[in-house]
A protein has these predicted regions:
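A short alpha-helical element within helix-turn-helix/winged-helix DNA-binding domains
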Residues: 46-57, 71
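Short, cationic-aromatic polyanion-contact patches
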Residues: 49, 83-100
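Extreme N-terminal segment that seeds HTH/winged-HTH DNA-binding domains in transcriptional regulators
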Residues: 1-46, 101, 111-134
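Residue cluster at the C-terminal edge of the helix-turn-helix DNA-binding motif
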Residues: 56, 73-76, 117
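Residues at secondary-structure transition points
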Residues: 19-23, 27, 58, 62, ...
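Beta-hairpin "wing" of winged helix-turn-helix
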Residues: 40-45, 72-82, 86-90
Length: 134
């Protein structure tokens, strides 16, 4: 007997930074927001289950559940009982404070990674300016 088609789980892997000082549930939310903003996560894509994320990251399922619940309240995710959790079909607008917070976090991470690779701040600024179209 042929099994019914199950929704295909889209590949999305969360990663945690234990040294960032950012709470784990907040890191999960930030990653989904960044994925949506960048287009890496599109409307309708299925996220891993709470249990799967908890096992993969070796964290408490309640932490994942809290993040998913908050994202659902914000309109980022839709949970369908018995089917899974999906990226919502609506465009999300972020407040000025949220955008500044995200930019600060991304910039800090970028500068840290580039510094570890041996790049100076001056080199980074030049590279960023070179990316900007005239």
């Amino acid at each position: 007997m042929k099994r019914s088609a199950e929704p295909e789980l889209q590949p999305f892997a969360f990663r945690l930074d234990a040294h960032s000082g950012v709470p784990v549930y907040r890191q999960l939310i930030d990653q989904v927001q960044a994925g949506i903003a960048s287009g890496a996560l599109e409307a309708g894509m299925q996220l891993p289950t709470v249990r799967q994320v908890a096992v993969d990251l070796a964290i408490n399922p309640n932490t994942v559940s809290r993040a998913y619940r908050e994202m659902e309240i914000r309109g980022l995710l839709d949970t369908q009982q018995g089917t899974g959790t999906f990226v919502a079909d609506r465009r999300v607008e972020f407040s000025k404070d949220e955008r500044e917070r995200q930019l600060g976090q991304l910039t800090s991470e970028f500068v840290s990674l580039a510094g570890a690779a041996g790049f100076t701040l001056k080199q980074l600024i030049k590279a960023l300016k070179d990316l900007q179209p005239e």
